[in-house]
Amino acid sequence: FERPLPKSLFNGKAVLMGDAAHPMVPFLGQGGCLAIEDAYCLSSLIKKIKDLDQMVNVYDQMRNKRGRWIQKRSRLQGLFNHVSNPVLTPVRNIITKISMRSSVTKIHSYDLNEELSLKINSQL
């Protein structure tokens, strides 16, 4: 299941997190991880930025960018996983091995605390 991502994670009344903010196919196993990151990010921003509009704007910038990138990678991984043509399967295996290594490295080397510090300091 996949649906388009919202343009913004804040509609004036509610802040979206987790699957509501960035629904994706499960081929990278990141849906729950993003929900935890979202909650941590939002709670950290609430503590540090008192202006609501400014706080949700920073949250939206941070989480929308990462969510979109992971959603795109997960979709591509799903396409590669389902290639069944015997001629293309060896090529798929090589591409998947390379792309997965790159994606997993980028996903797991992300430092939310570092990004929060940079964003919060630039807002104050």
Regions found by a protein language model. Give the residues of each.
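C-terminal auxiliary extensions adjacent to catalytic cores
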Residues: 93-124
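Long, charge-rich low-complexity segments
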Residues: 87-89
